Amino acid sequence: MPLPPTFLQRSGWRFLVLLPLLGACAEEATDHSNNKVLVIGWDGAGFELIDPLLASGRLPNLARLVSEGRTAQLESTRIPISSAAWTSAFSGVGPGHTGVFGFFEPLEDSSDVQLISSRSNHAPPIWRILSSRGVGVHVFGVPVTWPAEPVQGVMVAGMLAPHEGGFALPEAYEQRLLQMGFVPDLGVWRSNSLPDAKRVQEQLAIKEKALVELLGQDNWRCAVAVFKSLDVISHQRYSANLDGPVAKLLVDLDRILGSLIQAAGPNTDVLVVSDHGFRRYPRTLDLEAFLIQNNWTQRNPGTAPERRQAGPLALARPSAHRARMTGLDLDASRALAMECEGNFGSLRLNVIGRNSQGCVEPSQVPELLGKLEQDLRNLEIDGKKVVTQVWRATELMPGPKRLALPDLVFETVPDLRVVLGSGDILHARLPAGFPDHGLNGIAIMAGPSIAGETQRASWSVTDLGPTILHLLDQPLYREFSGSHHGEILHNPRPPKVIPMEQDPTLRSRSQVDGGSSRSNQEMQDLMRALESMGYAGSEGDQEVQGEGDPKTQGEEDQ
């Protein structure tokens, strides 16, 4: 059936989306055995731009979900970074249980780091839970899912996956994607350069075609697809301009959303979500400079930060970390800067027995954390204090997987971006502003199971996994820290909750992989290949690096 005129396609060609009336007959729906859940991720989307576009009528498919369903502001992890946020979202627990905090994890008994992978997640994601229970599931483009793991359907890894192959299972499906010209990651983690608009559009078309084919099959009950290109473009050109490149890409994603809803069919609950938002920051705070100026970190005499060298970030960032550690006197550095994103930063004490060159006695940790927290709270720029919150990571991110986690996480005033820079300049101004992550993402949902609600709720990103399982009437784990949000249902029902250890179907990652070393070997081969291409240089300008942004701090959008 044709849609109302507001649903006609932009840019000169028309399309008819058989968008189901997602709320129709929902009151009578009581059988959950055949309902499906489609989760679409728009990486980096925030209501600051979504709401004006909805009001302008340029996102008709998303507007239908809003009018028939409900919305929630989705608070990201602290810090708001895609690796931690998406992993926590689909595992239902925070970084203290997943072990994923940033894009790198420390090597034991070393000051070096390595790029994370899907095996860095110590918590079972929903696709493993569902597959272990025999539920069909497709996963397409979710960050930090490489190496791909076998699921009861198709798994196509997203951000951090290599372009050459080894990113999808079954292998026959990967060959089909390669023949179509598909690339799993458009950012600069595995590539020398960012994609232009033409390249983005080409990949969107390929991804849309592949997803429409998958969703048109009847062998799945849950499908998750993330569109990372929005984050990649936002790191370059984010603005609130409704005619800007990010807004135009959102319009394209809305059209694709209509195609995917049509392919999924009428008995499908649809969730459109993001891992964080975006904004422009007119000022920066160099965390390394703060630590040096307050005598928490000491430099080796005569050393200077090395400048950035071109190459994939998967290698450039670890090289930069090694160069940075070489430039520090670790025997005298009591605290070290860790991940920074948006107006959030993190720090870690250099503890003996935990850090390879630690200088802080474990007995000193409580006292020094208190002093470091006070120094952060006392930090002033232009006569005004700029740190608004400081958290102990053990309280903010409880859990046993703490190898990659900091000791303190802090938040600054909204216009001050925290960076891990050269350590020379504490504070810099960027009149045009620099694009980076914001804390709050989006959740927009509608479907036959979901009751409409006009008031916007507040959720945590960890709520997504439990809520998806509850929509499918699947048992939840007692260990989940996220909420299942049963209040969104037309007919609320109590959740089925079991301890993880009492789920006889659940398999570990090694059991899922079947003991195969294929993916481990692929990772080793990939890193050797990149090194042989000369991408082993260092990167000194980490203060300007977002998750896919190679610009230097002084550059402005053209």
Per-region residue spans from a language model:
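A long, amphipathic alpha-helix that forms part
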Residues: T30-S33, E48-D51, A197-A223, L230-V272, ...
